[in-house]
């Protein structure tokens, strides 16, 4: 209706796994929980993020254990359906953790950032998938590699239809989820990267690393999680 909001999250079970999805409707009358849905892969990690497509009709679940699962979403009922994998873990394919995903404005491409994790991983990647390909996982195309101490972070579609990517400078061994240990500023963490034409193929998407200046500030692994205020009603 262009007024209410859906809040969606997957349940995390310590020392176990769960396929439970919780959906809440936020309206002027309050917050109401919808029936719990059992759908998709049972995840065993709390390193999981959810991202809606620009139209709100699709939802991507990014599992840090190298799974990407795509769902259809009914904006009127809050019901998820049609789960299918964009990527399933293959030991020989990628190292590191899957960190963040984002749709292109036309919803034909999906972008993924991975972060290095562990002593044997020194590369973080920006990757594109073609959601219209007969075999989506086989369409995986690496756009750019970041080498330690530089790591990728969060992907976010902006109101200008460009996709922004934060970076993290891991130079002080403060731990994976912590802020910098010092006050040193570097070009690599004072600028974020930009995909200027994300509807295009990987070769033509015009990715420019470290190209958007943050006005003297530093970035980390994350970006703001802003809702899409321009979505409007379906009818």
Per-region residue spans from a language model:
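Beta-propeller fold recognition
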Residues: 1-73, 77-86, 93-235
């Amino acid at each position: 209706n262009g007024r209410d909001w859906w809040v969606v999250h997957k349940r995390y079970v310590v020392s176990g796994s769960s396929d439970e999805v919780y959906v809440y409707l936020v309206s002027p009358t309050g917050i109401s929980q919808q029936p719990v849905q059992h759908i998709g892969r049972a995840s065993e990690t709390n390193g999981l993020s959810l991202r809606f497509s620009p139209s709100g009709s699709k939802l991507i679940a990014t599992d840090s254990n190298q799974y990407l699962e795509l769902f259809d979403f009914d904006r009127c009922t809050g019901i998820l359906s049609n789960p299918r994998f964009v990527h399933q873990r293959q030991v020989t394919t990628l190292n590191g953790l899957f960190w963040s995903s984002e749709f292109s404005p036309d919803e034909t491409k999906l972008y993924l950032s991975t972060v290095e994790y562990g002593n044997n991983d020194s590369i973080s990647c920006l990757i594109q998938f073609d959601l219209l390909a007969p075999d989506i996982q086989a369409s995986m195309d690496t756009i750019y590699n970041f080498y330690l101490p530089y790591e990728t972070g969060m992907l976010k579609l902006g109101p200008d239809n460009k996709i922004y990517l934060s970076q993290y400078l891991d130079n002080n061994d403060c731990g994976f989820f912590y802020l910098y240990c010092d006050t040193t500023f570097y070009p690599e963490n004072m600028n974020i990267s930009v995909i200027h034409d994300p509807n295009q193929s990987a070769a033509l998407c015009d990715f420019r690393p470290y190209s958007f200046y943050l006005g003297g500030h530093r970035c980390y692994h994350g970006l703001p999680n802003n809702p899409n205020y321009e979505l409007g009603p379906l009818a």
